[in-house]
Every structure is written in structure tokens, then in C-alpha cells.
Amino acid sequence: MPTTPTDPCPCGRPADYARCCGPYHAGAAAPDAETLMRARYSAYVRRDAAYLLASWHPSTRPAALSLDEGGRTTWLGLTVQRTLDTGPETAEVVFLARYRIGGGSAVRMTEHSRFVREAGHWFYLDAR
């Protein structure tokens, strides 16, 4: 988990956290669905439940979000496989995230996420 603004951003882009996902976690609007998805991945790495809930569309947002408070999950990396603009205010992002729980083997998770833009802000809708 990054501890200073100059640490590399967990999302995989070649920038430090302060110039990459940090501004979105502080309230700036993501310019597109892929950027929002990367910021959400970084929020999982940083265990930032407040950002995850705020960036989740109200129609599908859970009442609460329980993250790995014991710190057993180690996020290992993110690969965006494709981004699809499905309409003027909708998009989908397919990505692969890698993580490890405790001392176990690394796990690869592929997700096909849907996003919607409302009032100039992108929101995570759901995944399939």
C-alpha cells in the first residue's frame, strides 16, 4: 500500500500516486471509465472503502463494504484487457487483477465491469 504521495500508483500507470489516482480519491471526477476502474483498484489496494462506496452507482451500491481489515490480502497487479465505449454515457472495462491471501498461492481474477456517467461523473455499476 502506498504510504507517501511519491510512491508508485498501484493502478499500474507510470506515475506516482499523487499524480495518478490520488486526486480521484480526494474527490476529482475521473475522465473515463478506465481511469475510474484503475482508481477503484488502487482504493482496494489502499483499503479505501469510502472511495469505493462513493464511486459505486447508488442503484447497485451496497449499504456497507467490508474490506480485508486484517491485511491478509496482498494485491499484486492490474492488467486492463480492453475498454469498450458502449454508449455516450456507458462503458465497460475488462481487466485482470492478481492478489494473494495470506501465504497462499496467487489468484487471478478476471472481471467485466460496467460503468455509467451521470452529471459528469463516472460510477461503477456492476460486473459480470
UniProtKB/Swiss-Prot annotation:
Superkingdom of origin: Bacteria
InterPro entries xref list: NTF2-like_dom_sf (IPR032710), SEC_C_motif (IPR004027), UPF0225 (IPR023006), YchJ-like_M (IPR048469)
One Pfam family per UniProt: YchJ_M-like
PANTHER family: ADENYLATE CYCLASE-ASSOCIATED CAP C-TERMINAL DOMAIN-CONTAINING PROTEIN, UPF0225 PROTEIN SCO1677
Family: Belongs to the UPF0225 family.
Name this protein carries in UniProt: UPF0225 protein XAC4297
Taxonomic classification: Bacteria, Pseudomonadati, Pseudomonadota, Gammaproteobacteria, Lysobacterales
